[in-house]
C-alpha cells in the first residue's frame, strides 16, 4: 500500500486508511470512537472521519472533545441534512481528496474489537494477487446485534438483526452494506461511484451502490473474523419494525430489477412477487404455533409485498432521518451505556 498524499490539511502525515462513521443525533458515537481508539493499527497510518448528517452540527462538540486525546487523526465533517447518502458521499469525498487507498466504514451505534482492522485487511491483501480484474475491491464483515433484556425469545434465538453478505449458490457475494465495510478506492469499479441521494431517506442506498460496483466488475470478499456489534434498541426489537424493514428491502430490490423494463414487464414481476408473498403467508399460517418459523415467513412475505408494491407504482417508505426514539445501549464491556436517540 503506497502512502497517501497530499496530506489532509492540519495533519502531520497523510493517513493511507480512513475509517468513516456517519452519525445522526447519537451519543452512542462516543462508544464507537472509544472502541476505534483501541484498534491495532498494525503499522498502518490510520485516521477517523465523522460525517454528521444532522441539520445543525450537533455531534461537533463530542467529536472535538474526544479528538483532543484520540490516538490518531479524528476529523469532523458537517454533512446536512437528514439524508444518509449525503453523509456517505462526504466520507467518500474526504478519502478521495486525501488520496487515501482504503476507506472503511462502521455505524455510529457499533463497536469493534482490537483486531477488527487486521481482520478486515486480511482478505483484501490476499485479494490483491492475480490479474487486475480478479482483485478484491471491497470487503464486508459481519454485524452482530446485541439484544436488550425483554427482547422476545424467538427474535434473540433467530439472530434476526445480524447482517452477513448475500451469496449465490457458487459462493459469490451479490450484494453489500455499509455497516462494516472496506472499499479500495484504487479499484476502477469504484471510480466516481457515489451513493444515490434519492435513496437517502428510504434506505437501500448501500444496496444500490454495491449493485453498481458489481455491475462495473467489482469483487467483494468476506472477513468473518472482523465482527462489529451493535445494540438493538427497543424500538427496533419488534416484529413490526422487522416487517417494515423487509418491505423497504423489497422495494429496493424491485427498484434495481425494474431498470430498463417496460410497464408491462414491471407489472408481470409484480404479479410474481404477489404470488411469492401469498405462498409465504400460507407457510406462516401452517407454522402458527412456532413463532420463530411463522415470523420468518411473514418477513419473507413482507419482502415480496414491498417488491410487488414498488413494481405496481407505490412510493418508497422512509425509514431514516426522522426524529429517533430514545433507547438504552450496551457498551463493549457489557455495561449499560448512555440513553439517547436512534437515528440513521
Task: Go through the PLM ranges and name each one.
Residues 79-98:
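Glycine-rich, basic loop-to-helix element that forms the pyrophosphate-binding segment
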Residues 244-248, 262-344:
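Non-catalytic, C-terminal membrane-associated alpha-helical segments of glycosyltransferases
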Residues 99-111:
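Short beta-strand-to-loop acidic/aromatic patch adjacent to the donor-nucleotide binding site
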Residues 115-153:
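Conserved donor NDP-sugar-binding/catalytic core segment of glycosyltransferases
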Residues 141-142, 156-174:
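Short, flexible, basic/aromatic active-site loop/helix in glycosyltransferases
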